Amino acid sequence: MLWSPLVVGGATAVLANAQIAAIRNSEINSGTDPRTHYYGLVDDANGQHFMRGRASGIPAGPQPDTVASGPCGIPAGFAGDQDQSYADWYGAHELGHTYGRFHPGFPPGAQDASDPAFPYANGQLSNADRKYVGYDVGDPQLGLEPKVMSGTTHHDVMTYADRQWVSAYTFEAIRQRLADEDAQFAPPVA
């Protein structure tokens, strides 16, 4: 993996993505698995240069050369952030775009509703039937206990809401996209 200390201002995710795409292209040409999705973390310089995350596109079909980037740092004033880093949920959201995921439109007025098929009210993980929940397996080595996230109080990673987790809807769509990418790059059958 190459390291490139790129310094960008607040609205230059396009430059970050161009550099990430160049790194990806170089690595793919050197034998890296072409199904590999690339995401760049851009340090916010202690809040002085916050860069909005951005994917280079939202592909309709398998296209793992779509890259994305987003900020990392300690959030100052982000409601709902529980772990002192917004790199985790920002990364999940922008990578979701590289797998063809759109916004469910929640909170209203804060994001476009470009995924009209999103099945759960208010960008939640489940409807009132509570059929789905989020589950974090934790990490005993880091002292992180497993936990269950309520499907009606937690929101899908493609929203701009707090308390994010991946919904069954988004999970299944990304799982299918991964299968499609596997098929796209499968070796020819003799």
What kind of region is each of these model predictions?
Residues 1-118:
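Active-site-proximal segment of zinc-dependent metalloprotease catalytic domains
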